[in-house]
Amino acid sequence: MPGLTCNACNMEFKDEEERNLHYKSDWHRYNLKRKVAGVPGVTEALFEARQSALAQEKNKSNEAPMLYTCAICAKGYRSSKAHEQHLQSRSHVLRVSQGTSINGEEDIAIIRQLPRRVQHRGSIDDDSEDEWVEVDSDEELAAEEASDSLSKLNVNESGSAEDMDDDGDADKYELDPTCCLMCDKKHKTLESCMLHMHKHHGFFIPDIEYLKDPEGLLTYLGLKVKRDFMCLYCNELCRPFSSLEAVRKHMEAKSHCKLHYGDGDDEEDAELEEFYDYSSSYVDEAGKQIVVSGETDNTVELVGGSELLITEKSENTTTSKTLGSREFMRYYRQKPRPTSQDSNQIIASLSSRYKSLGLKTVPSKEETLRMKVRKEMSKRGETMRTKIGVKSNVIRNLPNNVPY
């Protein structure tokens, strides 16, 4: 039957039986894959040559690898060609010429077979006994799980005990408040330490007039810097530091030798509230303190629009409660510590030193009035100077042809 052809292999056939046999051949399947990939087919001779080359490579891979060792030079090679090149090399010839030989023989090659790599995946029959694996019973599995859970529990308990020990060590950590935070220089008194830190490092305490516990404040700041490696100004906003030197270099480079206090951040201010006492500054327009003290006859009394005083009278005693505004909640929550006379003397001396050094402190009423008068005088002087400047900004010697 004429016209029987294969478009993939470019072959013509005499009958259908020959064509069907061709369709079952590997050569036709290979050309079909090439046709699907958009690549032209190959001839039968080229396909057979490729198949024979692949078979030779497979046989070589199946053969056991050999190791060729030169007894004179003590060198090993995986192929015979590399071993022959070594025998013709200059180093080998020099050793042979120098007379280094074994039992009078110059060229001795030790050829041995290398061990094959162990193949983990082997051909296993479906019905072989190696497929079957013994499985532990439910009781053994439960016992293993219980032992694992107990071991994990013991590990967690030991870890928690170590954490408790670390917390105990942190509580026992003591610090000398008379030691400088930046250079570890010791001083005899708190006052000399504060003056040193301000003079050499630019550190000062804000609102020192209301400070009630200077020793506690310096101890707390020292623990933050020397134990927790934390910047006094950045606090937790900055990346954590690994050592004390890193914290000190950061504070010196960024000029952070100061407290982040009084900038309007309630969280930062609440951290240092317990060391301050602002009760003396709570005054109204008439100069009276907002906090009410004393007994009153009325059961409920509104005081100054900021507090509500409630009194309860009994036969022997009289109790009173004060309800304040939310604006002063942060001050009501204070728990002031008992202050000693020594701390008051230190605060007074430090405030006087700060004033002598030119640092800003809380101004008095007279100073505020003077500042207002100075500002008004400076404003009036500026207006007068501008008027005089406008009038004098005229060219008086004009030429004759200018009428104005």
Curated annotation (Swiss-Prot):
Task: Specify the superkingdom.
Answer: Eukaryota
* One GO process term, biological-process aspect: ribosomal large subunit biogenesis
Any one cellular component term from GO for this entry? cytoplasm
Q: Where is this region: Disordered?
A: 119-169
MF terms in GO: nucleic acid binding; zinc ion binding
Zinc fingers, C2H2-type class: 4-28, 68-92, 178-201, 229-256
- Disruption effect? No visible phenotype under normal growth conditions. When grown at 10 degrees Celsius, the double mutant seedlings reil1-1 and reil2-1 show growth arrest at two cotyledon stage and die.
User: Which family, according to UniProt?
Assistant: Belongs to the REI1 family.
What interactions and quaternary structure are annotated?
A: Can form homodimer. Interacts with RLP24, RPL24A, RPL24B, EBP1 and JJJ1.
Under which name does UniProt file this protein?
Answer: Cytoplasmic 60S subunit biogenesis factor REI1 homolog 1
Taxonomy, top ranks, is: Eukaryota, Viridiplantae, Streptophyta, Embryophyta, Tracheophyta
